[in-house]
A protein has these predicted regions:
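Class I SAM-dependent methyltransferase SAM/SAH-binding core
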Residues: 58-115
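Conserved alpha-helix/loop element of class I SAM-dependent methyltransferases that forms part
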Residues: 29-57
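Conserved class I S-adenosyl-L-methionine
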Residues: 155-200
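Short alpha-helix
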Residues: 214-238
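A short acidic, Gly/Pro-enriched loop at the edge of an enzyme's catalytic core
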Residues: 117-126
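Core SAM-dependent methyltransferase catalytic element
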Residues: 230-232, 250-270
Length: 270
């Protein structure tokens, strides 16, 4: 099973390498945004994390992509940030951003389930979310890794897309079950078709037609169980009617906001 999971993660990493150009193209604008004190974290994230300067010497960001959110943690007050991602091109893009800003940041390219032991127990904060968890094929191992990276009393913060959004049709103008993906409790692995990045990459380069990405849904219950099993104490949980990306472009806001589209978890390592 572990070898199978590694293969799925590796194939997804290759696909993210191929789609990284979309992040590379925004490097200059991201650098200017961050240099001017910009913060890419959403309002609930900024409010819950508050001023990191008072308690966070080191923030670790799992599945950091191009690093814009990672570097925003410095704007939020963290003294040092560490970004981890499976895509080499994403990490290279993140490094270019931080080097231009002379930011106190370091970057590691690896599967998040194989993070080096040298990072054990150094994080005051572990930050993740906004499309990160569905790419993880073993949520129990993920929770154990999160605990490993945090200091005692270190905090995990997750701001993620709500699992209910998996079951809705993204092409309709009202809330309607997806024809195939309509079971909240499904454990089926799917091919990343919910995301625009692979589609846009294939449009630019038809040779990428065989890109393979693998994601699956984790229910809120599965996520909480994984964290409780490794000894986290829950501090905060909330749900929000705001999506973190334009997943339902045809649904009017007054209808869309009747359902949760994101959630946040703040938990402390024992």
């Amino acid at each position: 099973m572990r070898n199978e999971i590694s293969t799925l993660h590796r194939e997804t990493g290759v696909a993210w390498d191929a789609t990284a150009k979309l992040y590379e193209d925004s490097e200059k604008s991201d650098i200017a945004f961050l240099r001017d004190g910009g913060n890419n974290l959403m309002e609930p994230e900024q409010r819950i994390l508050s001023d990191l300067e008072t308690w966070c010497n080191c923030a670790i960001h799992l599945q950091c992509a191009g690093g814009k959110d990672t570097l925003s943690l410095l704007t939020q007050g963290a003294k040092e940030v560490i970004g981890i991602d499976i895509s080499q091109r994403m990490i290279a893009s993140a490094k270019r951003r931080s080097n231009s800003l002379q930011a106190n940041a370091s970057w590691y390219c690896c599967d998040v389930l194989d993070v080096p032991k040298s990072l054990d127990a150094i994080g005051d904060l572990l930050y993740t979310g906004r499309g990160a968890l569905p790419w993880i094929m073993d949520i129990q191992k993920w929770a154990a890794i999160v605990r490993r990276l945090l200091k005692p009393k270190g905090r995990l913060f997750v701001f993620e897309g709500h699992p209910l959004d998996w079951i809705w049709d993204t092409n309709t103008s009202d809330i309607r079950f997806h024809v195939e993906r309509n079971n909240y409790f499904t454990e089926k692995i799917v091919g990343g078709e919910r995301w625009p990045f692979p589609f846009l990459a294939r449009q630019e380069d038809p040779e990428l037609v065989n890109l393979r990405m693998h994601e699956r849904q984790w229910t809120l219950g599965q996520i909480f169980e994984a964290l409780l099993n490794v000894g986290f104490n829950l501090i905060h949980f909330d749900e929000y009617p705001i999506p973190y990306w334009d997943q339902f472009p045809n649904i009017p806001k007054e209808i869309l906001t009747r359902l949760p589209h994101t959630y946040s978890i703040l938990a402390e390592r024992n």
